[in-house]
């Protein structure tokens, strides 16, 4: 829209080109666009990939603007692949809870790196439903993930509860819930360290805004794709 407005205001053909790639939270789409004084978009490359674009100035065919949702998916995938590559990694690992956040992060990682480069860990506790575990397995199958580990956290959770009982007595409520989340974080980091994987956190921006994420739990990771 801004490019169109500049072309209309200046009554001139205006072009813009952008670099491609990710630099931490800064994402560049590699777009080449040209707008005419009448507001039409006459040149638009595919974007989100390196390459060279040759413009035919005689071709005035109008192009529709990219779909915002497609752009968001491409941007997040670009951010993941760029960060993973620049930190010297090839594959990632994340916890799969059967919920939407981890499903979305796993999907974005599969788009960015290929499903064979995405390692998932299901970490059920006594409170986990069979449906959650089934959903995580189904997600991995649909994405074509070849690395899916199932590690129960009950022994770790119970050991932590027993360790805290002399100091706290009954371990319940938020403290008990967060122990489970942090036990999962330890397992994700353990697999990451042992196999040279980059851990992805699965919290989202809304949770961060209201303090709902668990420090060292679902915030545990080198990159938080849904953080912004």
Annotate each predicted stretch with a short phrase.
Residues 1, 113, 143, 167-228:
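Active-site adenylate/phosphate-handling loop in enzymes that bind or generate adenylated species
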Residues 1-48:
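CN hydrolase (nitrilase-like) catalytic-core segments centered on the catalytic cysteine
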Residues 14-17, 43, 94, 150, ...:
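General beta-strand structural signal in soluble alpha/beta enzymes
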Residues 41-42, 49-75:
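Catalytic P-loop NTP-binding/switch module of NTPases
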Residues 47-56, 117-122, 126-175, 181, ...:
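A conserved beta-strand->alpha-helix junction
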Residues 68-93, 185-191:
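Phosphate/ATP-binding catalytic cores across multiple sugar-kinase/actin-like superfamilies
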Residues 81-90, 111, 115-118, 162, ...:
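Conserved helix-loop functional segments at active or binding sites
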Residues 90-96, 100-137:
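ATP-dependent adenylation/pyrophosphate-handling site
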């Amino acid at each position: 829209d801004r490019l169109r407005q500049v072309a209309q205001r200046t009554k001139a053909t205006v072009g813009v080109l952008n670099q491609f790639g990710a630099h931490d939270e800064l994402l560049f789409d590699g777009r080449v666009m040209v707008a005419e004084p009448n507001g039409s978009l006459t040149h638009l490359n595919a974007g989100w990939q390196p390459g060279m674009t040759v413009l035919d100035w005689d071709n005035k065919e109008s192009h529709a603007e990219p779909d915002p949702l497609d752009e968001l998916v491409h941007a997040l995938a670009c951010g993941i692949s760029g960060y993973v590559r620049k930190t010297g990694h090839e594959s990632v690992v994340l916890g799969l809870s059967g919920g939407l956040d981890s499903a979305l992060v796993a999907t974005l990682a599969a788009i960015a790196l290929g499903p064979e480069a995405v390692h998932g860990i299901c970490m059920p506790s006594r409170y986990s439903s069979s449906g959650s575990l089934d959903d995580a397995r189904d997600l991995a199958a649909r994405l074509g993930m070849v690395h899916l580990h199932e590690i129960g956290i009950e022994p770790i959770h119970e050991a932590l509860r027993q360790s805290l009982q002399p100091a706290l007595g009954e371990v319940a409520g938020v403290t008990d819930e967060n122990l489970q989340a942090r036990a999962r974080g330890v397992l994700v980091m353990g697999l990451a360290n042992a196999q040279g994987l980059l851990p992805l956190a699965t919290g989202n921006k809304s949770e961060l805004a209201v303090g709902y994420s668990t420090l060292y739990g679902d915030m545990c990771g080198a990159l938080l794709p849904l953080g912004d």
